[in-house]
Protein backbone atom coordinates (compact mmCIF):
# COMPACT_ATOMS: atom_id res chain seq x y z
CA UNK A 1 0.00 0.00 0.00
CA UNK A 2 1.24 3.49 -0.88
CA UNK A 3 0.40 6.35 1.47
CA UNK A 4 0.81 9.86 0.03
CA UNK A 5 1.45 12.44 2.77
CA UNK A 6 0.67 15.94 1.54
CA UNK A 7 -1.50 17.35 4.33
CA UNK A 8 -0.42 19.12 7.51
CA UNK A 9 1.04 16.79 10.10
CA UNK A 10 -1.32 16.31 13.10
CA UNK A 11 -0.47 17.89 16.44
CA UNK A 12 0.29 15.91 19.61
CA UNK A 13 1.61 12.92 17.71
CA UNK A 14 3.02 9.93 19.57
CA UNK A 15 6.22 10.50 17.60
CA UNK A 16 6.91 13.91 19.17
CA UNK A 17 9.83 12.53 21.18
CA UNK A 18 11.56 11.66 17.91
CA UNK A 19 10.91 15.10 16.46
CA UNK A 20 12.37 16.72 19.58
CA UNK A 21 15.75 15.14 18.87
CA UNK A 22 16.31 18.06 16.52
CA UNK A 23 16.88 21.58 17.94
CA UNK A 24 14.53 23.22 15.41
CA UNK A 25 10.94 22.74 14.24
CA UNK A 26 10.50 20.12 11.53
CA UNK A 27 8.57 20.44 8.30
CA UNK A 28 5.47 18.31 7.82
CA UNK A 29 7.17 16.08 5.25
CA UNK A 30 10.07 15.48 7.64
CA UNK A 31 7.65 14.40 10.36
CA UNK A 32 5.81 12.04 8.03
CA UNK A 33 9.13 10.54 6.94
CA UNK A 34 10.30 10.00 10.52
CA UNK A 35 6.98 8.34 11.38
CA UNK A 36 7.36 5.91 8.47
CA UNK A 37 10.93 5.07 9.50
CA UNK A 38 9.90 4.33 13.09
CA UNK A 39 7.00 2.20 11.82
CA UNK A 40 9.32 0.12 9.62
CA UNK A 41 7.95 1.33 6.31
CA UNK A 42 9.75 2.26 3.10
CA UNK A 43 9.83 6.00 2.49
CA UNK A 44 10.17 8.21 -0.60
CA UNK A 45 10.91 11.88 0.11
CA UNK A 46 10.58 14.32 -2.78
CA UNK A 47 11.51 17.91 -1.95
CA UNK A 48 13.43 20.83 -3.40
CA UNK A 49 17.18 21.08 -2.89
CA UNK A 50 17.93 22.85 0.37
CA UNK A 51 14.54 22.02 1.92
CA UNK A 52 15.91 19.48 4.39
CA UNK A 53 15.14 16.20 2.65
CA UNK A 54 18.36 14.67 4.00
CA UNK A 55 17.05 14.99 7.57
CA UNK A 56 14.98 11.76 7.45
CA UNK A 57 18.11 9.90 6.34
CA UNK A 58 20.06 11.39 9.23
CA UNK A 59 17.30 10.35 11.60
CA UNK A 60 17.41 6.82 10.19
CA UNK A 61 21.16 6.66 10.73
CA UNK A 62 20.81 7.64 14.39
CA UNK A 63 17.72 5.48 14.87
CA UNK A 64 19.19 2.24 13.54
CA UNK A 65 22.73 2.67 14.84
CA UNK A 66 21.28 3.16 18.33
CA UNK A 67 19.72 -0.31 17.91
CA UNK A 68 23.05 -1.87 17.00
CA UNK A 69 22.15 -2.13 13.31
CA UNK A 70 23.95 -0.86 10.22
CA UNK A 71 22.95 1.54 7.46
CA UNK A 72 24.13 1.89 3.86
CA UNK A 73 23.93 5.34 2.27
CA UNK A 74 24.18 5.36 -1.52
CA UNK A 75 24.67 8.22 -3.96
CA UNK A 76 24.96 8.35 -7.76
CA UNK A 77 28.45 9.86 -7.97
CA UNK A 78 31.75 9.56 -6.11
CA UNK A 79 31.98 13.28 -5.36
CA UNK A 80 28.65 13.23 -3.51
CA UNK A 81 29.67 10.12 -1.58
CA UNK A 82 32.89 11.83 -0.54
CA UNK A 83 30.98 14.94 0.54
CA UNK A 84 28.44 12.98 2.59
CA UNK A 85 31.23 11.04 4.25
CA UNK A 86 32.96 14.27 5.29
CA UNK A 87 29.73 15.99 6.37
CA UNK A 88 28.44 13.07 8.43
CA UNK A 89 31.79 12.53 10.14
CA UNK A 90 31.83 16.17 11.22
CA UNK A 91 28.20 16.16 12.33
CA UNK A 92 28.10 12.79 14.12
CA UNK A 93 31.52 12.10 15.67
CA UNK A 94 30.03 9.36 17.86
CA UNK A 95 29.07 7.26 14.81
CA UNK A 96 31.58 5.37 12.67
CA UNK A 97 31.39 5.96 8.92
CA UNK A 98 33.02 4.05 6.08
CA UNK A 99 33.50 5.11 2.46
CA UNK A 100 33.54 2.92 -0.66
CA UNK A 101 33.73 4.57 -4.07
CA UNK A 102 35.91 2.21 -6.07
CA UNK A 103 38.95 4.46 -5.64
CA UNK A 104 38.62 4.65 -1.85
CA UNK A 105 37.82 1.88 0.61
CA UNK A 106 37.94 2.83 4.26
CA UNK A 107 36.53 1.48 7.54
CA UNK A 108 34.69 -1.61 6.19
CA UNK A 109 33.19 -2.45 9.59
CA UNK A 110 31.68 1.00 10.22
CA UNK A 111 28.14 1.61 11.48
CA UNK A 112 27.26 3.49 8.30
CA UNK A 113 28.76 2.67 4.90
CA UNK A 114 28.62 5.35 2.20
CA UNK A 115 29.05 4.25 -1.41
CA UNK A 116 27.87 4.61 -4.98
CA UNK A 117 24.78 2.66 -5.96
CA UNK A 118 26.79 0.48 -8.35
CA UNK A 119 29.02 -0.76 -5.54
CA UNK A 120 26.00 -1.84 -3.51
CA UNK A 121 24.51 -3.48 -6.60
CA UNK A 122 27.68 -5.52 -7.14
CA UNK A 123 27.81 -6.50 -3.47
CA UNK A 124 24.20 -7.69 -3.53
CA UNK A 125 24.89 -9.67 -6.68
CA UNK A 126 27.78 -11.42 -4.90
CA UNK A 127 25.61 -11.99 -1.84
CA UNK A 128 22.78 -13.54 -3.87
CA UNK A 129 25.20 -15.70 -5.84
CA UNK A 130 26.75 -16.99 -2.64
CA UNK A 131 23.34 -17.85 -1.21
CA UNK A 132 22.29 -19.68 -4.36
CA UNK A 133 25.46 -21.77 -4.25
CA UNK A 134 24.86 -22.72 -0.62
CA UNK A 135 21.15 -23.48 -0.49
CA UNK A 136 21.94 -26.95 0.88
CA UNK A 137 23.22 -25.28 4.07
CA UNK A 138 20.61 -22.58 4.39
CA UNK A 139 21.01 -22.00 8.14
CA UNK A 140 24.68 -21.09 7.94
CA UNK A 141 24.99 -20.01 4.32
CA UNK A 142 26.06 -16.44 5.00
CA UNK A 143 27.09 -16.11 8.59
CA UNK A 144 30.01 -18.51 8.24
CA UNK A 145 31.72 -16.86 5.27
CA UNK A 146 35.45 -16.86 5.94
CA UNK A 147 38.05 -16.44 3.20
CA UNK A 148 35.41 -15.35 0.69
CA UNK A 149 34.59 -12.19 2.65
CA UNK A 150 38.02 -10.78 1.93
CA UNK A 151 37.05 -10.62 -1.73
CA UNK A 152 34.04 -8.41 -1.02
CA UNK A 153 34.18 -4.63 -1.23
CA UNK A 154 32.95 -4.34 2.34
CA UNK A 155 32.18 -6.75 5.14
CA UNK A 156 28.65 -6.76 6.50
CA UNK A 157 26.20 -9.46 7.45
CA UNK A 158 23.30 -8.37 5.28
CA UNK A 159 20.81 -10.71 6.95
CA UNK A 160 21.62 -9.85 10.56
CA UNK A 161 23.22 -6.40 10.55
CA UNK A 162 21.81 -4.35 7.68
CA UNK A 163 18.60 -2.53 8.63
CA UNK A 164 18.30 0.28 6.12
CA UNK A 165 19.53 1.55 2.75
CA UNK A 166 19.29 5.22 1.82
CA UNK A 167 19.11 6.01 -1.89
CA UNK A 168 20.13 9.64 -2.36
CA UNK A 169 19.14 11.24 -5.69
CA UNK A 170 16.95 8.23 -6.45
CA UNK A 171 15.51 10.00 -9.51
CA UNK A 172 18.59 8.63 -11.29
CA UNK A 173 16.45 5.52 -11.68
CA UNK A 174 14.99 7.31 -14.72
CA UNK A 175 18.41 7.73 -16.33
CA UNK A 176 18.52 6.01 -19.73
CA UNK A 177 21.98 4.55 -19.16
CA UNK A 178 22.35 4.01 -15.41
CA UNK A 179 18.77 3.70 -14.20
CA UNK A 180 18.81 -0.07 -14.44
CA UNK A 181 21.45 -0.15 -11.69
CA UNK A 182 18.96 1.37 -9.24
CA UNK A 183 16.26 -1.05 -10.38
CA UNK A 184 18.52 -4.08 -9.93
CA UNK A 185 19.72 -2.90 -6.52
CA UNK A 186 16.20 -2.38 -5.21
CA UNK A 187 15.05 -5.76 -6.53
CA UNK A 188 18.00 -7.59 -4.95
CA UNK A 189 17.60 -6.09 -1.48
CA UNK A 190 16.30 -8.56 1.12
CA UNK A 191 12.73 -7.85 2.22
CA UNK A 192 13.72 -6.97 5.79
CA UNK A 193 15.83 -3.98 4.68
CA UNK A 194 14.04 -0.64 4.89
CA UNK A 195 14.50 1.76 1.98
CA UNK A 196 14.64 5.53 2.32
CA UNK A 197 14.66 7.24 -1.05
CA UNK A 198 15.48 10.91 -1.50
CA UNK A 199 14.66 12.82 -4.67
CA UNK A 200 14.53 16.44 -5.81
Predicted feature locations:
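Long, intrinsically disordered low-complexity tandem-repeat segments
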Residues: 130-143
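Helicase-associated low-complexity/disordered flanking segments
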Residues: 1-43, 133-136
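Conserved P-loop/Walker A NTP-binding site and adjacent catalytic elements of P-loop NTPases
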Residues: 24-130, 150-200
Amino acid sequence: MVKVCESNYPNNSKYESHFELFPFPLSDFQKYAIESIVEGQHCLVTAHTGSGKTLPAEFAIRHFVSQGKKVIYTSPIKALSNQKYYDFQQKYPDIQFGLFTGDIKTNPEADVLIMTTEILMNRLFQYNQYNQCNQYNQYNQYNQMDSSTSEMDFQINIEKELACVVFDEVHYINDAHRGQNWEKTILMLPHHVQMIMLSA
